[in-house]
Amino acid sequence: MKILFLGTPLYASRHLEALLSAGHMVIGVITQPDKPAGRGLRMVHSPVKDLALKNKIPVFESLKDFPFDRLTPDIGIVVAYGGLIKKKFLDLIPFGYYNIHPSLLPKYRGAAPINRALENGEKMTGVSLFKLTEKLDAGPIVLQVEISVDCFETFDSLENRMIEAGKKILCDFLKNPESFELREQDHSQASYAPKITPADLFVDFRKDSEAVKNKIRAYDSRPGARTFFHGEQVKLFGAVAIEKCHSGEPGTIVHIDDKGAYVTTSDGIIVISQIQFPSKKKMSFLSALNGRMLRVKDRFQS
């Protein structure tokens, strides 16, 4: 089958790479336009565009620019494209468009399912392959695979596991798409994972230890959970809840060792392994202590 691939970030490019490695015929790619990045604001290709150009695959920035009458794709594969597909385009491909989504639909429809699942402390999530319709992430399911979430999972580790699962079910599906039955979603069970806002990144140490831990791991390593320290915005990485009792104001550093900073919450203590100060690289709390950048009894603002 001739495949039209729609996707933008590294998450999507790894799925495209799997299709190419399996020998599938990708006749075109739709990806978001180049964006300015870095201090020099140099225009940068998306990871999907980079991979497509490397493999001499035609690249387009929107479906309206794609020559459907000349390239005639049989099926569309969508992975983290970053835009909705209008009905007039849905009808232009014989077999339709199929989307890989990192949640067990109908749960966590929307832009940030991995972050939101971790933030909510989910113990089970997964990957869904479904047929696109006009409504957001609401089309019938083709395949799903469950993925358990352990207490040490971070965004990075869970995303990597999601990618591996997504690559497998996508390649399994494309071996014989006609053999799979579609199953309608139970829309009454739908929940949503809205796009991350800057306010979502901030840690509130007045919450319980589990909530604080989940907030930090949901954005580890990118874009990084935030808090204020002596009026500066800092990022926090790696968190484990260890105690259910303490004394002291939430956000107070009560101890620092090679495991990290022991910080009070509303109901206990959480160990945070790394900190990143503005214009600095990530470092251990012990390094920050030795560099006199912080000390025991300092407090993060909530």
From Swiss-Prot:
Enzyme class: transferase
Reactions the enzyme catalyzes: L-methionyl-tRNA(fMet) + (6R)-10-formyltetrahydrofolate = N-formyl-L-methionyl-tRNA(fMet) + (6S)-5,6,7,8-tetrahydrofolate + H(+)
Matching Pfam families: Formyl_trans_C, Formyl_trans_N
Entries under SUPFAM superfamilies matching the protein: FMT C-terminal domain-like, Formyltransferase
Molecular function GO labels: methionyl-tRNA formyltransferase activity
Binding site for (6S)-5,6,7,8-tetrahydrofolate: S103, L104, L105, P106
One of the record's GO cellular component terms: cytosol
CDD domains: FMT_core_Met-tRNA-FMT_N (cd08646), Met_tRNA_FMT_C (cd08704)
Segments forming a coiled coil: none
Keywords: Protein biosynthesis, Transferase
Gene3D superfamilies in the record: 3.40.50.12230
Enzyme Commission no: 2.1.2.9
Family: Belongs to the Fmt family.
Main function: Attaches a formyl group to the free amino group of methionyl-tRNA(fMet). The formyl group appears to play a dual role in the initiator identity of N-formylmethionyl-tRNA by promoting its recognition by IF2 and preventing the misappropriation of this tRNA by the elongation apparatus.
Protein name: Methionyl-tRNA formyltransferase
UniProt source species: Pseudothermotoga lettingae (strain ATCC BAA-301 / DSM 14385 / NBRC 107922 / TMO) (Thermotoga lettingae)
Upper classification of the organism: Bacteria, Thermotogati, Thermotogota, Thermotogae, Thermotogales
